[in-house]
Amino acid sequence: MTQSSIGRIWFCQIQRLLALIVLIGLSQGLSQPAFARGGAAQVDAELVFAVDISYSMDQAEQVLQRNGYAEALVSEQFLQALKGGLYGKIAITYLQWASYRDQDVILPWTLIDGPESAAAAAAKLRRAPYRRAQRTSVSGAIDSAMYLFENNGYDGLRRIIDVSGDGPNNDGRPVEAARDAAVAAGVTINGLPLVGIRPYLGYADIAELDLYYQDCVIGGDGAFMIAIHDRKAFVDATRTKLVQEIAAPRIRPQPSDILPAQALSPKTNCMIGELMWNRRWRN
């Protein structure tokens, strides 16, 4: 046997060995349990409830928001949608926000996998104390929510930020910049703007907050908003939103599949809140 023949035999054997290694690796990868990102538990969605507590939100509106989320979590419609998910569970956290420096979490990341865990989370929300704070930074809320996703112990098919509030951004960086950064990372931002709940407009309020949320706040794969015009509608709107989010397609969107901003050019001045604030205080 010549030296060249021996070389060809060794080359073929090495090829077979490499192919076997690849097949073993693929089979092991396919048989891994439902954990990812360093052991994070897989869920259908990771949701941040980002709720406005600025002074434009009076006590009644704050109670309305909080109870809306609590009641939606224990509703039959939500629990049925939860069971229909690929994993039958989601992870939630509740973030309160005002200025870009003022955010706090009153419900840390919590696994919701059925009626008992949903009821326990709802009870914690209802027990948490209320507070109010200065300014309205929607961008700060989005940025803080993005931080909360990191190393939270969960790996959701979707990551969603639910922004609820009654006014435009007037503090922190421009809201479009925060939204676009979140969308570019594959996160969906949905909205629950409170529009015309009070019979008057304050100096930091705008009449068409729903259009502002549509053009400047929400974004990402399947993003939507539900404008709330009546206090009595908050529970129904929150429940509808949660059901729609859980029932959404269960494949995590890739950043390359998502437009970094709204598909159409904004019709609303997304700096309106900052302009109104500066005009009010002449700075």
Q: Can you say where each PLM-predicted feature lies in the sequence?
A:
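Bacterial N-terminal signal peptides that target proteins for export
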Residues: 2-19
